[in-house]
């Protein structure tokens, strides 16, 4: 799952990473869009996971993919305890469980006015109240530092990942 701008800027490296995953015998999907809200991403992941012939096992979020800022779920965290009345950026939990745990139900609240990638969602009591992801997920999101090109960070990281996957690291070959 990648935003259009990040894909345009790091197409060669993203395609090389995709090929390295496929070389391990795994199928891949490439979901590219100008993501404005998290719901369409979650819906597509659920559809791909429900495919009986080739169910989705996991996903990687690359670049500027919306971040679900979960509210009303402090009981699911191990160490994060804060009054929900505090500033929402501080009292919400950024969590990709929004995308990978399909038994959790959420109600969309709003998009953050300052950080547009933040989308506040409330954990609904109608869904499960424990975490058991259906797929695995990871996120490749560059840090924002003045003078550093975030797309170069993505390119550099993916080059390292592909190089590591091509090395014969015996720890990756467990039997």
Placement of each model-derived feature along the sequence:
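Cysteine-dependent hydrolase recognition
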Residues: 1-175
């Amino acid at each position: 799952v990648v935003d259009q701008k990040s894909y345009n800027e790091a197409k060669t490296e993203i395609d090389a990473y995709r090929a390295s995953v496929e070389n391990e015998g795994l199928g891949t999907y490439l979901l590219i869009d100008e993501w404005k809200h998290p719901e369409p991403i979650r819906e597509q992941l659920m559809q791909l996971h429900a495919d009986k012939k080739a169910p989705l096992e996991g996903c990687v979020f690359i670049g500027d993919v919306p971040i679900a800022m979960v509210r009303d779920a402090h009981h699911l965290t191990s160490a994060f305890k804060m009054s929900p009345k505090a500033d929402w950026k501080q009292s919400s939990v950024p969590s990709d469980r929004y995308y990978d745990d399909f038994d959790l139900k959420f109600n969309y609240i709003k998009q953050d006015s300052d950080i547009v990638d933040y989308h506040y969602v409330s954990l609904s009591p109608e869904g499960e109240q424990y975490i058991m992801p259906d797929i695995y997920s990871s996120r490749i999101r560059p840090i924002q530092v003045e003078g550093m090109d975030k797309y170069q960070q993505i390119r550099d990281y993916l080059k390292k990942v592909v190089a590591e996957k091509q090395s014969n690291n015996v720890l990756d070959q467990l039997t």
